[in-house]
């Protein structure tokens, strides 16, 4: 899948832009601060319903504008149209094929997109929440019913926590919590197992350290989820929240028995983060028969020449639509771009 057309208004420093993208390699050049990364944000917004730079979408609105608007059209034909409007006062509105949708998950179904940017080390360095989103995004693409189970589990978890805090009976919500929680855990565990060869291949081809990747389900494997909820019920009542369950799952990255974020440099963490993105792109392409569009924001940042060339070599072999930023076109040795755009002072033109 790929993005054929991007149109936007009032996103960060970009007042208005329209790009006809190629399904292969697209290069966006321009000085720092010109708006290159903002174009990637617009594309990412179409596939994820959020920015990769901030949790607050309203921060993307150009300072003098009341709202932003982004529109995209996907391939292959007949494709889909995606429209997103974000208003300072009324939040975000999403439309797919002109019909309003309430869930951002529906965006990923029509336009899957991944980002490799200078901050990708945070996928390794930060706490578990980013790795949870990374894994669940992929599970959504390959497991029918995952979103439905996730929504039901989240609702049951809220109700159980409310009961724990109010002194009501928390067991009323446990059957639904267990039913949906076990389905979530099975789907996540299965994907993690199937992902392993893609992870090892991406990690090794990039020359990253040989870190292992494993899955912690959110409670001890010595007990069922029902047993774990029962064992921790008194503790949960004292704390007013559910301490064990699929909402506490983690993707663990370890080297010699230690968490890699404790022992690796920023550059090494970045390589592992890139390997995670590449591995997931390969997996989705194989398992879901759809190849995500891959965004690369300044791929040479913080990597030496050898590692940059290794990254670009791996990326070239994915068969994905690529949208890459660089200060100058010659700084991205990916071969001849199929489309080149230049951004200057918030204005975009095709070269």
Would you name each region that the model predicts?
Residues 44-130, 136-146, 193-201, 230-234:
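Nucleotide-state sensing region of NTPase/ATPase domains
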Residues 297-299:
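Walker B catalytic acidic pair
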Residues 72, 320-327:
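Structural recognition of the conserved hydrophobic beta-strand(s) that form the central parallel beta-sheet
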Residues 1-31, 45, 57, 168-179, ...:
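Conserved NTPase motor "head" modules and their coupling/switch loops across ABC/AAA+ ATPases, GTPases
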Residues 36:
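Conserved lysine of the Walker
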């Amino acid at each position: 899948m790929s993005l054929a057309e991007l149109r936007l208004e009032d996103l960060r420093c970009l007042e208005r832009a329209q790009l006809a993208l190629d399904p292969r390699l697209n290069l966006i050049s321009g000085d720092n601060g010109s708006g290159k990364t903002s174009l990637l944000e617009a594309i990412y917004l179409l596939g994820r319903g959020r920015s990769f730079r901030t949790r607050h979408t309203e921060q993307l609105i150009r300072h003098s504008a009341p709202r932003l608007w982004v529109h995209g059209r996907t391939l292959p034909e007949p494709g889909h149209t995606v429209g997103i409007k974000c208003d300072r006062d009324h939040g975000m509105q999403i439309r797919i094929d002109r019909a309003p949708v309430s869930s951002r998950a529906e965006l990923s179904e029509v336009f899957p997109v991944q980002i490799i940017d200078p901050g990708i080390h945070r996928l390794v360095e930060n706490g578990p929440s980013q790795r949870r989103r990374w894994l669940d995004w992929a599970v959504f693409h390959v497991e029918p019913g995952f979103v439905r189970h996730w929504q039901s589990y989240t609702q049951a978890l809220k109700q159980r926590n409310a009961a724990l805090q109010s002194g009501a009976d928390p067991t009323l919500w446990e059957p639904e919590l267990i039913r949906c929680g076990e389905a979530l855990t099975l789907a996540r565990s299965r994907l993690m197992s199937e992902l392993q060869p893609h992870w090892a291949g991406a990690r090794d081809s990039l020359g990253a350290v040989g870190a292992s990747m494993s899955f912690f389900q959110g409670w001890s494997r010595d007990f069922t989820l029902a047993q774990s909820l029962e064992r921790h019920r008194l503790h949960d009542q004292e704390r007013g929240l559910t301490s064990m369950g699929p909402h506490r799952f983690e993707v663990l990255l370890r080297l010699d028995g230690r968490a890699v974020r404790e022992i690796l440099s920023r550059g090494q963490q970045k390589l592992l983060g890139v390997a995670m993105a590449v591995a997931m792109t390969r997996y989705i392409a194989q398992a879901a028969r759809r190849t995500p569009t891959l965004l690369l924001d300044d791929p040479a940042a913080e990597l030496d020449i050898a590692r940059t060339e290794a990254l670009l070599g791996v990326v070239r072999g994915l068969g994905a639509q690529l949208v890459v930023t660089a200060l100058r076109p010659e700084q991205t040795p990916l071969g001849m771009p199929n489309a080149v755009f230049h951004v200057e002072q918030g204005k975009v033109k095709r070269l």
